[in-house]
Structures are given as C-alpha cells and as structure tokens.
C-alpha cells in the first residue's frame, strides 16, 4: 500500500477553499460572461483555457513546498470591527494584495507567458476565495477552522462547513451547479466593484456567520436551509466579477 500517496490525497482534501466543486462552478459561470477578445487572450496564456480547471490549480499546488510562500494569498484575517483598509497588512501578503499583484502582472506587456499563466490561474482562484466569507475571518480562530462543530453528527469545523460540506451534500457536479446558479440569478443584478470593496462585503457576511454558530454546535438540514442560498449567490457573484475583472484586463 502506498501510504505516502494516501497521505498526500488526504492533505489535498483539506486544501480546497470553497471546495473543488464551488471553485469550478465559479470558473464555469465566469466563462459565460467573457468577451471574445478576452477568451482569445486566455487561450494564448493557458494550454487548457478552461477557467473551471484553472480555478483549482492554486490549491492543487499547495502541497508543493515551493508554493508554501503563497499560502497567505488565499485569505486575510483581521478583527471583526476593523475594515481591511484600516487594518495592519501582513508582510506575507493576503488575498487582496495577491489579487492586485495578479492583475498588475497580467497587464504587463513585458511579463512572460509562464508568469502570466501563473498569475492568471491564481487570480481565477483568489476571486473565488475572497467571496467565501470565512476567508475574511478572525485570526484568533483561523477563519473558523478552530470553531469545532458537528455536521450531521460528524466532527468538523465551521470553515469546512462553508468550504465544502453544504455544497457537496447537494451532490451536484460543478457544471450542474453552474447551470443552477445561472438559472436562478441574473448577472445584471450583481454590483461589480473591485477587490477593495469585495473584502468589505465579505467581512459583513462573515460577522453574520460568526453570530449564528458557537463552538460545539450541531449543524445539519436547518443550517443548509438557512445558508445555501447565500453560498450560491456568493459563487455566482464571484463568477460574474471574475469575468468582469478579466474583461477589464484583456479587453479594455
């Protein structure tokens, strides 16, 4: 038995913010709103131009020691009563700083294709991350990772409930979820904004998430009923905003 392989697979199962299904659904939604010019530019950069596939690359690479320096790019932790603009910024970076770095690189005509591919895959992923409220959580509980709860009787934590459990319990593929989102939400209703405003929006949402759950709570169907619509809206919103961001980069 290959225990090393089993260990790696187990570790990867804990490394997918929004979960693989959520991230890929967001990428799939974004593809519906790209301009033709943006599509062509993405095809020049990525061997596989699928944004759904690109969306999980940044998590898949986290088991690589060379990518550990980018771990802080996936989130930002700050006090619940302090806006990001007024908070102390981490020297290791955070999701807002990382999105800005990616956008700057993709607009740089002197950047290599390899650099652009790296930053494009990261950008697709990070726009999803910033819309998961617990990626804008409190440092003291590591974005809900230290809030232990029961999910249908099984031990887990609040962060994982939002990342994967609620989405995965509906047993939809990412394409089915993306179609469901587009059939239930309208892109024209989404306020686009930028990452500086997205972070404020997610902070407001995470304060609500924290207010509803305590350590050792038991969660199940009622919690799904109360929160899945918000999760779906966040996934769809991330997709629409990702498309707008990419169109602004590649088709100004």
Identify the function of each model-found stretch.
Residues 1-21, 25:
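Bacterial Sec-dependent N-terminal signal peptides
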Residues 18-124, 133, 138-252:
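N-terminal, motif-rich segments that launch catalysis or mediate targeting to/interaction with membranes
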């Amino acid at each position: 038995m290959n225990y090393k392989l089993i260990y790696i697979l187990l570790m990867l199962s804990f490394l997918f913010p929004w979960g693989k299904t959520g991230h890929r659904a967001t990428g799939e939604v974004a593809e519906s709103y790209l301009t033709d010019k943006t599509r062509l530019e993405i095809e020049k950069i990525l061997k596989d131009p699928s944004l759904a596939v690109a969306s999980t690359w940044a998590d898949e690479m986290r088991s690589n020691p060379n990518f550990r320096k980018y771990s802080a790019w996936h989130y930002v932790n700050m006090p619940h009563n302090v806006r990001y603009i007024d908070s102390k910024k981490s020297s290791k970076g955070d999701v807002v700083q990382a999105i800005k770095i990616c956008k700057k690189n993709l607009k740089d005509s002197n950047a290599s294709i390899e650099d652009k591919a790296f930053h494009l895959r990261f950008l697709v992923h990070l726009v999803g991350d910033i819309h998961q409220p617990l990626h804008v959580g409190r440092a003291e509980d590591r974005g809900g990772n230290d809030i232990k709860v029961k999910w249908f009787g099984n031990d887990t934590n609040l962060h994982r409930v939002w990342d994967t459990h609620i989405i995965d319990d509906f047993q939809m593929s990412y394409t089915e979820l993306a179609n469901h989102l587009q059939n239930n939400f309208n892109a024209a209703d989404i306020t686009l904004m930028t990452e500086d405003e997205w972070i404020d929006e997610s902070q407001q949402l995470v304060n609500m998430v924290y207010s509803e759950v305590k350590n050792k709570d038991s969660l199940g169907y009622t919690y799904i009923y109360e929160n899945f619509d918000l999760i779906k809206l966040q996934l769809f919103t991330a997709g629409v905003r990702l498309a707008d961001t990419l169109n602004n980069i590649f088709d100004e």
